[in-house]
UniProtKB/Swiss-Prot annotation:
Protein name in the entry: Na(+)-translocating NADH-quinone reductase subunit F
Biological processes per GO annotation: sodium ion transport
UniProt topology in membrane: Single-pass membrane protein
Keyword Isomerase found: no
Family label: Belongs to the NqrF family.
Length: 405
């Protein structure tokens, strides 16, 4: 009798647990189709599940997300009028309490479980997707490649200087030992044993890159991509997924991009423009400066200050030298923080924020009246911003392409 009672009790417990799991599943796991109403106009029907960012992309609505949906950039904002659940702690570092009360959410953090009513920026509807072909993918510096893509014939990406596109990467495995690196850059690759790394990605990923090309360069998209290797203090960390994929691309390969996106645009004023860049932050600097001079024929005073470690890290030198020779309102300067003996460098040395201050802004009549456009490593951006604040420059005249977080 006790055995039978035990079996019955065990069966009851198992059934109770099964019912609890089914109940929880009904609450936590979405099933069936849901409808998302967009801007009081479009109604999208799709299977429940996943995040709102991906759900919209599956319907051809590409909300910008510089971090590829990781929740760190804060750019994939939408207004959720109904559905979507409560705002998550991961969103509150990007969204103020007032914005939260108005329904502002990060679409990469919103679960698609029930019918929703949302608003997205109107410019999102102008975003498209293209399958491009790799023209070239050459080293411009030790850790920077210039990826040049051909847009499909008859198409164009209607971007503004300072804008960016998003690149999709399929699941892949990339071995750094297979990279084609010119011998002049091998010294650092050998020093840090970068050939050892392998990047393995099991699902599609999405990342944003600022364009180095400017709108008059028709039919192509140019990017400057820095390889994201593990930091020296954490050598066993995985290398950057998207940068590893991009560095593996060869002429003729197909690449899917979407865009254009952006907010790092030049102001339409007569103020002096001061561009400050470093590393792969060269990309939007080139796009802006070429656009101002070659397309807009701007008469504004324009200076460009670029920081690099050594001459090996300098690129587009001939391009900017030609601009300086052609346009008297443009000058450019490079500062090397760690020049090599063989560089025979007699130009500026030190960190770029100090060089800009000592050689341009220290005795400037009104630095607060200039517009400052910058893009570079986080430490550079922070140093430049502090220097500008100390000079009395207002936030509205400090424009930053913050690709480094």
């Amino acid at each position: 009798m006790e055995i039978i009672l035990g079996i019955v009790m065990f069966t009851v417990i198992v059934l109770a647990l099964a019912l609890m799991i089914l109940f929880a599943k009904s609450k936590l796991v979405s099933e069936g189709d849901i409808t998302i109403k967009v801007n009081d106009e479009k109604e999208l029907t799709m299977p429940a599940g996943g995040k709102l960012l991906g759900a919209l992309a599956s319907q051809g609505i590409f909300v910008p997300s510089a971090c590829g949906g990781g929740g760190s950039c804060g750019q994939c904002r939408v207004v959720v009028k109904s559905g979507g659940g409560d705002i998550l702690p991961t969103e509150l570092s990007h969204i103020s309490k007032r914005e939260a009360r108005e329904g502002c959410r990060l679409s990469c953090q919103v679960n698609v479980k029930t019918d929703m009513d949302i608003e997205v920026p109107e410019e999102v509807f102008g975003v498209k997707k293209w399958e491009c072909t790799v023209i070239s993918n050459d080293n411009k510096a030790t850790f920077i490649k210039e990826l040049k893509l051909a847009i499909p014939e008859g198409e164009e990406v209607p971007f503004r200087a300072g804008g960016y596109i998003q690149i999709e990467a399929p699941p892949h495995t990339v071995a750094y030992k297979d990279f084609d690196i010119p011998k002049e850059y091998h010294e650092d690759w050998d020093k840090y044993n970068l050939w050892q790394y392998v990047s393995k990605v099991n699902e599609p990923i999405l990342r944003a890159y600022s364009m180095a090309s400017y709108p008059e360069e028709k039919g192509i998209i140019m990017l400057n991509v820095r390889i994201a290797t593990p930091p020296p203090r954490v050598p066993n960390a995985p290398p950057g997924q998207m940068s590893s994929y991009i560095w593996s691309l060869k002429p003729g390969d197909k690449v899917t991009i979407s865009g254009p996106f952006g907010e790092f645009f030049a102001k339409d004023t007569d103020a002096e423009m001061v561009f400050i860049g470093g590393g792969a932050g060269m990309a939007p600097m080139r796009s802006h400066i070429f656009d101002q001079l070659k397309r807009l024929h701007s008469k504004r005073k324009i200076t460009f200050w670029y920081g690099a470690r050594s001459k090996r890290e300098m690129f587009y030198v001939e391009d900017f030298d030609q601009l300086a020779a052609e346009f008297p309102n443009f000058t450019w300067h490079v500062a090397l923080s760690d020049p090599l003996p063989e560089d025979n460098w007699d130009g500026y040395t030190g960190f770029i924020h100090n060089v800009v201050y000592e050689n341009h802004l220290k005795n400037h009549e009104a630095p607060e009246d200039c517009e400052f456009y910058m893009c570079g490593p986080p430490i550079m951006n922070q140093s430049v911003i502090k220097m500008l604040k100390d000079l009395g420059v207002e936030d509205e005249n400090i424009l930053l392409d913050d690709f480094g977080g």
